[in-house]
């Protein structure tokens, strides 16, 4: 995937921001969300499983 970007700079030429096209932004956002979900799943993979009814009761508390 090639990323086309433009930079926003201040009067001294320091980069202050980046402009991405919308499709690129959405793809990056999707990848980050997928990565976050993966990390959350890895954190709990060794925890004890509970059934649906128990989970519902815990959420109601």
From Swiss-Prot:
The gene is relB2. Pfam families: RelB-like (PF18506). This is Putative antitoxin RelB2. Keywords: Toxin-antitoxin system. Antitoxin component of a type II toxin-antitoxin (TA) system. Its cognate toxin is RelE2 (Potential).
């Amino acid at each position: 995937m090639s990323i086309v970007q433009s930079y926003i700079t201040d009067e001294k030429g320091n980069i202050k921001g980046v402009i991405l096209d919308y499709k690129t932004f959405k793809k990056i956002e999707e990848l980050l969300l997928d990565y976050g979900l993966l990390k959350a799943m890895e954190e709990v993979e060794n925890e004890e499983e509970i059934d649906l009814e128990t989970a519902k009761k815990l959420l109601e508390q």
